[in-house]
């Protein structure tokens, strides 16, 4: 599966970066307020008309002759832009997203690694 972040696709590198799993289709939580009112058996629910940001986790496989340089390039691609950027997937879904926390790299072989990326995102409607 292909994806792009900040208008650059995962297929535009000199190394191979393949998205193997993503939870981007998980629905965001509705934003509401629950207010306890004395004498009432249940809470008053106020719908704020919004959805909360969600966390998207993508797992990719990286294949490169030099994992260190490839990881630096991935970091620069995902973490250099300041603020929210467009994250889109080949199924047509699109989000305003920012990388949340570390980009986790787990080396599998000398030339292969598993990359885990977490984004804080809200859906573009």
Residue spans of the language-model regions?
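Extracellular/virion structural assembly segments
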Residues: 1-125
């Amino acid at each position: 599966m292909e994806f792009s972040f900040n208008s650059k696709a995962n297929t535009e590198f000199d190394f191979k970066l393949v998205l193997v799993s993503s939870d981007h289709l998980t629905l965001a939580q509705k934003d509401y307020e629950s207010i306890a009112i004395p004498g009432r058996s249940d809470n008053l629910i106020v719908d704020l008309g919004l959805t909360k940001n969600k966390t998207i986790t993508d797992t990719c496989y990286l294949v490169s002759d030099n994992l260190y340089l490839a990881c630096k390039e991935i970091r620069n691609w995902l973490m250099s832009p300041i603020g929210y950027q467009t994250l889109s997937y080949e199924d047509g879904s699109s989000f305003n997203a920012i990388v949340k926390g570390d980009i986790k790299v787990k080396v599998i072989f000398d030339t292969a690694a598993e990359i885990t990326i977490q984004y804080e995102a809200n859906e573009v409607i």
